[in-house]
C-alpha cells in the first residue's frame, strides 16, 4: 500500500466526477493483439475470420454510439486514416489521453509498441475543436516511454475527482513514479496505489477492470487486493461512497468496467456491457440504479478479443465547450 500526499497542495476544490461527453474510436482494424495479450488475461481469440470479427466489432461499436446518444450523452467519434501501421486496440482510447475541466489534454506512455501508434494528438485536437471543445493546453508524459515507464491513463488510474484522489493498481502498465508526476501536474493531492492479484498470481493489467468510481458509489473487486492493503482501500472509498463489492468471477464479466456519465440535461447514466449487467446480482443492479439509469450494451466480440469492455471504449471529455 502506498498513499502519497503531494506537498504544498491546496485544499481539494470541487470538481465534476461525471463527464457529459466522451470520445469513441471506431474499431476499423480491430483484432486480437498479441502484444497486449502478454499481460492481459482478459483477452481470448475467437475462431472467426478477420472480416467477421471486424463486422461484429463495428456493429457493436455503432450500437453503443447510438445508445449513448439516444440517452443524451454527447459522443465525439474520432476517426483516423489507416496510415501508421495496424492499431487493433484503437477502440480503447481511454488509455492514451485524458482531459480536465480547465481545457488540458494529457498524453500518456503506453507499454505496447502498436498501441503507441494510436497517439494522434494533433488530429484529436482538430476533431475536438471542430465539435466546439476548447483545448487550451497540452501536457505530455510520452518521454517516459524511453525509460520503459508506463502509465496508461484512465485504464490504470480510477479517479475520484471531487476528492482529488487517484486510485491505481500497480503493474507493468502503471509505474509509480510516472503516476506521482501526473498527480502533481494535475494538482491531485492524494494517490492511493496498491497491488492486485489474479488467481494465477499475476497483477491485473488495468485498474479499471476491477473498480469504478461514480459520484456517490464505487464498484470494486476487493478480493483481488492483498488483504494487508484491502481494508485501507475500501475504508478510503467508503468515506463518501456506497461500496459495491464484486467477485473475481463478476470482474471477469467486466462488472468493474463501467462508467457513470451525465446527459445534456444533467441526468446520470451508467454505461456497462450486457455481460456485466447479467453478472451483477439483482441487489447490486438496484443499488446501481439509484445512481443513474443503467445502459447495458452488447459488446461480446470487443470484450472477448480485446480484453476490454464498455468503460475502456470511453474516453471522458471534461473540456469546456467554446462559447
PLM regions and their residue ranges:
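The feature marks the mature, well-folded catalytic cores of soluble enzymes
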Residues: 1-323
Amino acid at each position: 500500500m502506498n498513499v502519497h500526499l503531494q506537498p504544498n497542495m491546496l485544499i481539494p476544490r470541487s470538481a465534476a466526477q461525471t463527464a457529459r461527453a466522451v470520445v469513441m474510436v471506431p474499431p476499423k482494424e480491430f483484432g486480437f493483439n498479441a502484444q497486449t495479450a502478454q499481460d492481459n488475461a482478459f483477452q481470448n481469440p475467437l475462431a472467426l475470420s478477420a472480416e467477421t470479427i471486424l463486422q461484429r466489432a463495428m456493429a457493436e461499436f455503432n450500437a453503443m454510439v447510438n445508445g449513448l446518444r439516444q440517452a443524451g450523452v454527447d459522443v465525439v467519434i474520432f476517426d483516423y486514416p489507416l496510415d501508421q501501421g495496424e492499431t487493433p486496440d484503437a477502440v480503447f482510447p481511454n488509455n492514451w489521453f485524458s482531459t480536465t475541466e480547465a481545457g488540458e489534454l494529457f498524453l500518456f506512455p503506453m507499454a505496447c509498441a502498436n498501441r503507441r501508434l494510436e497517439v494522434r494528438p494533433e488530429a484529436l485536437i482538430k476533431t475536438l475543436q471542430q465539435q466546439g471543445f476548447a483545448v487550451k493546453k497540452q501536457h505530455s508524459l510520452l518521454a517516459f516511454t524511453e525509460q520503459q515507464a508506463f502509465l496508461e491513463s484512465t485504464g490504470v488510474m480510477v479517479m475520484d475527482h471531487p476528492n482529488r484522489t487517484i486510485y491505481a493498481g500497480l503493474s507493468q502498465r502503471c509505474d509509480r513514479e510516472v503516476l506521482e508526476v501526473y498527480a502533481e501536474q494535475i494538482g491531485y493531492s492524494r494517490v492511493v496505489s496498491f497491488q492486485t492479484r489474479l488467481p494465477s498470481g499475476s497483477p491485473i493489467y488495468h485498474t479499471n477492470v476491477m473498480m469504478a468510481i461514480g459520484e456517490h458509489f464505487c464498484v470494486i473487486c476487493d478480493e483481488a487486493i492483498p488483504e494487508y492493503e484491502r481494508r485501507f482501500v475500501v475504508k478510503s472509498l467508503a468515506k463518501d461512497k456506497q461500496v459495491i463489492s464484486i467477485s473475481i468471477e463478476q470482474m471477469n464479466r467486466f462488472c468493474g468496467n463501467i462508467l457513470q456519465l451525465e446527459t445534456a440535461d444533467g441526468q446520470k447514466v451508467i454505461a456497462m456491457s450486457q455481460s456485466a449487467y447479467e453478472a451483477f446480482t439483482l441487489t447490486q443492479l438496484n443499488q446501481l440504479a439509484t445512481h443513474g439509469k443503467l445502459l447495458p450494451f452488447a459488446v461480446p466480440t470487443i470484450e472477448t478479443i480485446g480484453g476490454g469492455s464498455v468503460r475502456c471504449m470511453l474516453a471522458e471529455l471534461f473540456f469546456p465547450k467554446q462559447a
